[in-house]
Amino acid sequence: MGKTIVEKIFDAHRVEELPGGTHVLRLDAVFAHEVTTPVAINELVSLGKDRVFDASKIKAVIDHVTPAKDSKTAEQGKVLRDWARRNNIEDFFDIGRNGVCHALFPEKGFVRPGSTIIMGDSHTCTHGAFGAFAAGVGTTDLEVGILKGVCAFKTPLSMKFNITGSFRKGVFAKDLILSIIGKIGVNGATNRIMEFTGELIDSLSMDSRMTLCNMAVEAGATSGVCYPDMTTVNYLWPFIQDAYASKEAALADYSKLVSDPDSVYDAVIDVDASDIEPLTTFDYKPDNIKTVREMSGVRVDQVYIGSCTNGRIEDLREAAAVLEGYEIAAHVRGILSPATPAIFRQALDEGLIAVFMDAGFVVTNPTCGACLGMSNGVLAEGEVAASTTNRNFNGRMGKGGMVHLMSPATAAATAVAGHIASSPFFEG
């Protein structure tokens, strides 16, 4: 019987197998940010275990509320900052060098095919786009990971999504993952690995693959994963070129990280991307999906473009292509948050920031901020946002606010129209 890509990663990292199908895995990296990690840090300090298993494998960033908005968030940042200094963690990214973790860490080359990664953050699944096993964990598992460099997981069950066809105009990776979540539901992949394969996936950039894997958790998945290929190699080449004689040699190595043809899946689901329209959410669950055409005319107060889902350079290009030459509706507040300083700088160099500003957007520093209603774009009660983020739970971006999830291009069209824009807007 063949093995899936994640089963192969488990085999390569297993240090112990426990009763009940639990596997203790060696970790290649533990990622940390200032909201969840301080809880683990304080607990370890109280136990007299203020140390890390390997400082070179810890990557930490202050990203959720930066700069700090109040004493509480300042204290969270201080706990992480002081811990990083005490434990000689060199890869710590403070204000000025920081970005949204799930964009910054891949950009820095910290994610490699076949690696194992944990973080106290549910969207750690983003990094599966590189052919890694990456999962969000709770405080106890995070503490063990920091201290011992291991983490326990159940035997992985996988769902295979075979994506064929091509995107029509105005459709992007965000629409694809919204379509999938809409079909299987928020519990449709619970405790599963969502494995994305097929000709459409092969054609996607790393930015788009990260968007897909980022939202796997919204279907209940432990993680998402794509097979590494030459697109992966090209993205990582500045960081791996000393280890390989050529890109072809790197590809030959990474090409082993695919599922065998006779792998056993919990489910195999075929998706024709050609059938997908621009999509958005309604109500307060990410599986409540309607076409933008059906939702056309729904008034919005704010449009937010950014986050670990859609704050990368490709996303900014897609939105700017729609915005150029237009101004956003007078009643709309437009907020752009490039996910990292490098993305911000590249957007400046390409003239994208000017497009957003000319259209009427305010541009913030890289931060999670508005996505979880912590800063830089919190909604008032009764307000409605069009957002490129990943969650639309009740109160997610502010108590009593409504969030409609969508692609950056759809968000840009919505900002100009002043209401959720139907797909013909892209053809205008």
Protein language model regions, located:
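Fe-S-dependent hydro-lyases/dehydratases of central metabolism
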Residues: 1-428
